[in-house]
């Protein structure tokens, strides 16, 4: 459960930074560009809280509150890149539907789980599509800001975080100190911090 503190900390730092950025133009040309990042950092904060809630007493009913904030977090980051590489107007129109899609993917899993055949395919799509779409947009579309490497690093570190999660039992049996799931939490929080660090240092081009 302690590994969830990283999500909470990065989420709070990110939201605080966005609040400060509203009073200084540094990382954003237009104030509305903050909204997708607000969803991202709020999602990280809620991921930490939701995951702690689940791990306190694991069960399917609580697992939805672990998965939902993370799905929203990923959609927020994807929409932030859409805002900067495709267009702010497009991103703002997509933000609500993307959050709804994230919620629907978890809701669909919960519904099918109750019927005895939990279907994670929509949730997996929400998880992995941003990891493909973000690097492609960074590569193919012109940048409006410096710091693209920070976004690429965040996507890469989060993708890396999925490896120890899939090898959870092996990591714990080898390390005897932490589980693969714990390592995943730490790496995912680091991915979130990469985004915050990028925002702190980037400039318009």
Write out the residue ranges for each language-model feature.
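Active-site rim beta-loop-alpha module in soluble metabolic enzymes
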Residues: 104-145
């Amino acid at each position: 459960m302690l590994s969830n503190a990283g999500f909470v900390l990065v989420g709070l730092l990110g939201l605080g930074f966005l609040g400060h950025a509203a009073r200084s133009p540094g990382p954003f040309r237009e104030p509305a560009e903050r909204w997708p990042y607000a969803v991202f950092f709020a999602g990280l904060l809620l991921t930490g809280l939701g995951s702690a809630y689940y791990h306190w007493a694991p069960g399917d009913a609580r697992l939805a509150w672990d998965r939902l904030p993370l799905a929203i977090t990923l959609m927020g980051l994807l929409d932030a890149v859409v805002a900067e590489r495709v267009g702010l107007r497009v991103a703002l129109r997509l933000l609500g539907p993307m959050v709804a899609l994230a919620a629907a993917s978890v809701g669909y899993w919960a519904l099918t789980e109750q019927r005895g055949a939990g279907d994670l395919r929509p949730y997996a799509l929400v998880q992995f599509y941003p990891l493909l779409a973000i690097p492609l947009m960074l590569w193919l579309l012109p940048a409006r800001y410096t710091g693209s490497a920070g976004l690429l690093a965040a996507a890469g570190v989060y993708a890396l975080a999925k490896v120890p999660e899939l090898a959870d039992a092996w990591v714990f049996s080898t390390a005897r100190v932490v589980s693969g799931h714990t390592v995943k939490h730490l790496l995912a929080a680091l991915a979130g911090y990469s985004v915050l660090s990028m925002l702190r240092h980037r400039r318009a081009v």
